[in-house]
Amino acid sequence: MSPTSDFVNTTSTAKGHEIIAGLTAKPVEGSTITLCKDIIREFFDKVQVPSPNFTRDPELEARVADIVRTWGNEEHLRPYVVTSLILTVTAYSHIANFETRVQITLFTIIIIAMDDPVVFDSLATREFHQRMCTGVIQDEAGMLGAFTKILESMWDHYSGFSANTIYASALRFVNASIIENETDVTTLRSHALPFVEYKRSMTATTEAYACFIWDKARFPDVKVYMQAIPDAMLYVSYVNDILSFYKEELAGETANYIHERAYVTGKSIPDTLRNLINETASAVERVRDILGEGEARAAFENFAAGYIRVHTGNPRYHLKDVIGGDYIIDRV
């Protein structure tokens, strides 16, 4: 699609900047580390989430390793196992049921793995939805067959509404991954912010990770937390975008939410990051107001703190370079 006044077309220059409709987008100001330090400090100041200590769970690690071994390609999946374990022992450490934590971990391994084009292309992902409807894929061995069994188990661990939502979120993620792997998404219309938000929501499986916060054993009544789900979803997306920024800049990645939002809104990268911080802080306050005091609020607060630690305690995001500290798990 050729660029006109109605389209935003992005391509890389030799200097690593981006061209938007014939104009150079505003580059990141100053060094990446300095910017990230400032952004992360501002994020912590505005969101006001505590920083509790989290520990490894050897039993969970052993159980997950045994299951992943049956999927094949264990070595290639190892980095995704590390990230998924860290997510569970931090953001979902408040969940008492061991089997629920196992399923969250396995779900996450497959979601992250399918985000890898090498893994995605090795699976029959493009026919996933149709084969799910016909019941064929449920009997297959390997990762996609395992994924269907994980999804089937969600009704054992979450209320009907939440389990339905988790299932639908997973299907939306696979659909979005197909689009990202088959379509040139570097060309955006100049007023495409709603599409950028829509795509980000699908690829982040935000509905699933929001619903994971409130398991059925403690929260059988969805009405207790349902109105908080949209802002919890926003938190899932934006915290990841803010705290993944350093990793993505190191890798030279520009096909991501921060850059795409900056392009379609005409803002600089630092301004875009600060807007996300403000929107995240507002979302946290709304969740707190909606949930009030009690167990549902406590579950969210644990998730909010743990989800930050997912990024600061994980070598995947390289944030030790920026803010110091130690990683929870370097490898398994």
Swiss-Prot record:
Residues that coordinate or bind Mg(2+) 2: 240, 244, 248
Cofactor(s) of this protein: Mg(2+)
Residue sites binding Mg(2+) 1 per the record: 115, 180
Gene Ontology molecular function: carbon-oxygen lyase activity, acting on phosphates; metal ion binding
Chain location of the short sequence motif NSE/DTE motif per the record: 240-248
Sequence motif DDXXXXD motif, location on chain: 115-121
Enzyme nomenclature, EC number: 4.2.3.-
The UniProt record lists the keyword Nucleotide-binding: no
Disulfide bonds: none
UniProt domain comment: The conserved DDXXXXD and NSE/DTE motifs are important for the catalytic activity, presumably through binding to Mg(2+).
Function, in words: Terpene cyclase that catalyzes the cyclization of geranyl diphosphate (GPP) to myrcene and linalool.
Family of the protein in this entry: Belongs to the trichodiene synthase family.
Protein's name in the database: Monoterpene synthase 25
Origin organism lineage: Eukaryota, Fungi, Dikarya, Basidiomycota, Agaricomycotina
